[in-house]
Each structure stands twice: as structure tokens, then as C-alpha cells.
Design a protein with these regions (language model features):
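A conserved active-site cap/scaffold subdomain adjacent to cofactor or substrate pockets
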Residues: 231-303, 307
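Conserved small-residue-rich beta-alpha loop and adjacent elements
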Residues: 107-173
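Alpha-helix C-terminal capping segments
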Residues: 141-152, 176-178, 196-203, 220-222, ...
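C-terminal core of ALDH-fold dehydrogenases
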Residues: 321-433
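Conserved NAD(P)+-binding/catalytic subdomain of aldehyde/semialdehyde dehydrogenases
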Residues: 179-257, 261-266
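N-terminal Rossmann-like NAD(P)+-binding subdomain of aldehyde/semialdehyde dehydrogenases
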Residues: 1-122
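General beta-strand structural signal in soluble alpha/beta enzymes
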Residues: 105-108, 126, 156-158, 182-188, ...
Length: 433
């Protein structure tokens, strides 16, 4: 049963939640470093060797690329209702991310014109896990912001099944709907390395996004600096702040929707109501017994599920800001009144009819969110992740001459005489021997 704690015990809760990540594993790190180094040096030979070793299937340069026929077969396996829902999700995700676009701007001035040039990345790679973890919704969330940003080429990698086909065909449909240009049947750390450095079959990308297991996450961290990455995601979490206006059945259902993800997922309720805390605790027990993934749910709730009773809602907000959850629900009578107190959260769901699964699939904002407390300094995946920005400076001769003495003074103060000379030489004041 999910425990009920007092606010004074929230420090222990924070420690448990923040320490869930399994990324700090020396043996995994060693294996990943070896895989990345081999793929970087040997290209396809190493990539396909690891595919045989880990996925138990032989791939070649001729078979690794997903064909149009494979995509057509995937469409045939999709129900019309699911396709309609995916198209609606894609429409909403695209519309939301269109509002994030920034254009190049330049403030023209006779003295000095300043601005910023916004340029889409040339090529992006999206990692999609295999099997039951190949969520088509994640394909949309990773690809559509890149399309909105204007990325010229988007390629996807996903592990093959033992028969050589993509292990979860609906991921192919999602990729096609989102506008992926090429899909390769490779997975694991070796696929991340192929994207980062390129092989004979797979082109090098500028950035890698998408979720994966501990090997994929470590591989992304290993190649960061050679390419950009979205983030190194840890286990998922939700924190619900609720008062007496909340329906305990709804709150319990929302907590369980997170707990069913993974034994490492954290589902937390913060409330100022003893009555609600007890009612939600009972509802969680009742609903868990009805759910097919109850084994996962029970492990998650036993390890990381908690109900915290605090004196006031602002106290709940303070606890929430310390945890900095991936998802936060404000299931209170006045969510907009509480919102200014929330500083650290990946996504915030306001009111009794904004459950976290709505954001997972159809609302429009991105569901790729900072986890494990990183909402203190990271943001959701967005259009900004798929562009780069260059500063623009165009100075007139008169303006440069006007500020030249100050520029040269600052340069010389830092011991950089060549910097000062680059200004001085334009006005007959260059350094003399």
C-alpha cells in the first residue's frame, strides 16, 4: 500500500526519488565506451556485428534501410480509428510547436545594426526503442518539432526483430505520418554511435533525440560533444498537488497512470487534506487490483509511491519545487492561484480535467520532459532544440571609431594586444615595432 507521510519526512522522499537513476553503472559505461569506439572506427562492420550479437539478426547495407513496402504493410496493420487519433495528435503537436518558432531578426541602425540569425539543423537522428517500449506517440513528439523547425533531413533508428523487420510496425506508421526521411533497422548503443559518427550506410547527424534503455542513455552521454543530444532521461515521475475539491478516484487514477510505466517510476501526492489522503490511498488499492500491469504498479508504489500531507498548499508547492518533477498536476480549486508558486516542473497540468495522459498523447505540448529533478535547469523538447542561433553585428566606420578607445582599453586590460590592434589598425593607430 502507498504510504502516507508528514511534510517533515519529505527530505527522505526527495532522496529516494532523486536517486532512482541507474545511469551510474561502471560496467555499462565500459561496455558502451567499447561499442562507441568500435563503431566509430569500423563503421558498418562493427554496427552489423553488434546487431547480430544483441538483436540476433543479420543486417547488411542492403537490408538495413526500411523500404516503402514495409511501411505499407505497417499501415495495413493499423486500425482506421488509431490512424485518425494519430493524425489528430500530429495536428495538435504541430500547431503548438508552430508557436515556438523564432525568425531571424535584425535591428537596422545607421551606427550599428544588431540581430540574430536562426538556422535549422541540417540532419537529426531520432532513436525509437523496440518492442513494447516503441511508443508511436514518442515518434511524433521527437520528429514534429524538428519538422516545424525546418530540419532538412530526419532519420530514425529502431531495433529489428529476429525476423529482420521492425519489432513494432506502428512506429513506422508514426514516422511516416510525422515526415521522417529514412528509417534504419538498428538499435542500442551501436545505433547511437552510428548516428553520431556516421557509417557507410548511416549518415552522421547533428543531434540525437529519443528515449532508450540504460545502454542507449549512456551512449548518448558518451557521444555528446561530437553531436548534440536532447537530454539523458531517467525514470518518469508525476507529482499531484490536490485539495478537498479533488476527486480521490481521479487522483488515484492519475498516480497509477504513471506507476504503470516502470518499477522505477515515482507517483507522489501532496495534499493539505487528511481526508483526501486516506481516500486516495484506498482508491489506489482498489484500482490497482483491476489493472493488468499491477505487478509493475505495486513495485513502483512500494519503492517510490508516496502521499505527503502538509499544513498548506504552499507547503505542498515547496516540496514539489524541491523534487522538480517531470509532470505536475494542480488538482485544486484554484490552480491558477497556485501556479505562481511552482518553479520547477517539466509540464504542469491545471485543474481536475487535465490528466497527465492528455499531455502524453493529444494536448499538443511535448511529452519529452526533464526527469529526476532536472526540471530545475532543463526544459521540454521544443523547436529551439532543432535550431542554432548566430549573432549578427554590422558596424559603421563612424561608430567603430567612436567606441574604439573603449574597445582597445578593455582588450589591453586583458593582455590581448592583437585584439586592440585589430581596431587600431583601421584608424592608422596600429602597433609599431
Amino acid at each position: 500500500m502507498i504510504p502516507i507521510l508528514r511534510a517533515s519526512d519529505a527530505g527522505e522522499l526527495k532522496r529516494r526519488v532523486m536517486n532512482r537513476s541507474q545511469l551510474q553503472n561502471e560496467e555499462v559505461s565500459r561496455i558502451v565506451k567499447e561499442i562507441v569506439a568500435r563503431v566509430r572506427q569500423e563503421g558498418d562492420a562493427a554496427l552489423f556485428d553488434y546487431t547480430v550479437k544483441f538483436d540476433h539478426v543479420t543486417m547488411t547495407a542492403e537490408t538495413v534501410l526500411v523500404t516503402k513496402d514495409e511501411i505499407a504493410r505497417a499501415y495495413a496493420a493499423a486500425s482506421p480509428e488509431w490512424l485518425d487519433a494519430m493524425r489528430e495528435a500530429a495536428r495538435r503537436i504541430t500547431a503548438f510547436h508552430e508557436k515556438q518558432k523564432q525568425n531571424t531578426w535584425l535591428n537596422f541602425d545607421p551606427a550599428i545594426s544588431l540581430g540574430q540569425k536562426v538556422t535549422p539543423l541540417k540532419r537529426v537522428g531520432v532513436y525509437v526503442p523496440g518492442g513494447t517500449a516503441a511508443y508511436p506517440s514518442s515518434v511524433l513528439m521527437n520528429v514534429l518539432p524538428a519538422k516545424v523547425a525546418g530540419v532538412k533531413e530526419i532519420i530514425m533508428v529502431t531495433p529489428p526483430g529476429r525476423d529482420g523487420s521492425v519489432s513494432y510496425p506502428l512506429a513506422l506508421v508514426a514516422a511516416d505520418l510525422a515526415g521522417v526521411d529514412k528509417i534504419y533497422k538498428v538499435g542500442g548503443a551501436q545505433a547511437v554511435a552510428a548516428l553520431a559518427f556516421g557509417t557507410e550506410s548511416i549518415p552522421r547527424v547533428d543531434k540525437i533525440t529519443g528515449p532508450g534503455n540504460i545502454f542507449v542513455a549512456n551512449a548518448k552521454r558518451e557521444v555528446f560533444g561530437h553531436v548534440g543530444i536532447d537530454m539523458v532521461a531517467g525514470p518518469s515521475e508525476v507529482l499531484v498537488i490536490a485539495d478537498d475539491s479533488a476527486n480521490p478516484r481521479y487522483v488515484a487514477a492519475d498516480l497509477l497512470s504513471q506507476a504503470e510505466h516502470d518499477p522505477l517510476a515515482a507517483a507522489i501526492l501532496g495534499t493539505d487534506s487528511e481526508t483526501l489522503a486516506a481516500a486516495v490511498q484506498a482508491e489506489i488499492a482498489r484500482q490497482t487490483a483491476l489493472l493488468p500491469r499491477r505487478d509493475v504498479i505495486e513495485k513502483s508504489l512500494t519503492a517510490y509511491g508516496t502521499i505527503v500531507v502538509a499544513p498548506t498548499l504552499p507547503d505542498c508547492a515547496d516540496i514539489a519545487n524541491q523534487i522538480a518533477p517531470e509532470h505536475m498536476e494542480l488538482s485544486v480549486a484554484d490552480p491558477y492561484g497556485l501556479l505562481p508558486l511552482i518553479e520547477n516542473a517539466g509540464a504542469i497540468f491545471l485543474g481536475h480535467y487535465s490528466p497527465e495522459p492528455l499531455g502524453d498523447y493529444l494536448a499538443g505540448p511535448n511529452h519529452v520532459l526533464p526527469t529526476s529533478g532536472t526540471a530545475r535547469f532543463f526544459s521540454p523538447l521544443s523547436v529551439d532544440d532543432f535550431v542554432k542561433k548566430s549573432s549578427l553585428i554590422c558596424c559603421s566606420r563612424a561608430e567603430l571609431e567612436r567606441v574604439s578607445e573603449q574597445v582597445m582599453l578593455l582588450a589591453r586590460q586583458e593582455g590581448l594586444d592583437a585584439h586592440a590592434n585589430a581596431v587600431a589598425i583601421r584608424f592608422g593607430k596600429e602597433i609599431k615595432a
